[in-house]
């Protein structure tokens, strides 16, 4: 099965459906999870953890880190996946540390090239750390009109980076 395809169990019907990672991330987001949970949840199994643990790990990162409007949760979710995939397991493993940072930098560059920005409040055009900003986001239906694009973009970029890494690893 290609890396881009995942089997996902629809919670309400219990039936098996096949979708790519960006679609899976968007589906998780539409189920009510935050943007970070959606991205890491879609890639959890590929990164060596179960989806429930991934979603719990990312629970505080929505809305730009606990709704502070800082780094977009779709971005931090991808960064967590990169860390799980490449991160060091020994403090002295500087090679894996550098590989992780290299992959994060590449991800950030690609996300910024698509969207211009990395901060939630700038991407949305409102400050979700304030009641007024949250109301603006609600009134504008940003959860359905803006955020899904960032979740999909993040998942597409992450999928591409992980696939490129798999190809390089298989050539060595």
State the predicted function of each range.
Residues 2-18:
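Short, Lys/Arg-enriched N-terminal segments with co-localized hydrophobic residues
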Residues 18-31:
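Polybasic, low-complexity association/targeting segments
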Residues 35, 72, 120:
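Short cysteine clusters
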Residues 42-60, 126-131:
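Acidic-glycine-rich active-site phosphate/pyrophosphate-binding loop
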Residues 47-56, 84-103, 166:
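Phosphate-handling active-site elements
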Residues 61-80:
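Glycine/serine-rich anion-binding loops at beta->alpha junctions
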Residues 101-172:
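C-terminal binding/interaction regions
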């Amino acid at each position: 099965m290609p890396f881009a395809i995942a089997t996902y169990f629809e919670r309400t019907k219990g039936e098996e459906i096949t979708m790519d990672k960006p679609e899976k991330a968007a589906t998780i987001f539409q189920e009510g999870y935050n943007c970070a949970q959606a991205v890491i949840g879609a890639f959890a199994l590929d990164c060596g953890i179960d989806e429930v643990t991934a979603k719990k790990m990312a629970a505080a990162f929505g809305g730009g880190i606990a709704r502070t409007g800082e780094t977009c949760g779709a971005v931090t979710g991808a960064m967590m996946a990169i860390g799980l995939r490449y991160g060091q397991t020994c403090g002295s493993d500087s090679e894996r540390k550098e590989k992780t940072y290299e992959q994060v930098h590449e991800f950030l560059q690609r996300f910024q090239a698509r969207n211009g920005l990395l901060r939630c409040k700038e991407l949305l055009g409102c400050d979700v750390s304030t009641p007024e900003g949250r109301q603006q986001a609600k009134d504008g239906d940003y959860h359905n009109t803006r955020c899904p694009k960032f979740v999909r973009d993040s998942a597409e970029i992450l999928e591409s980076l992980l696939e490129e890494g798999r190809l390089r690893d298989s050539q060595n």
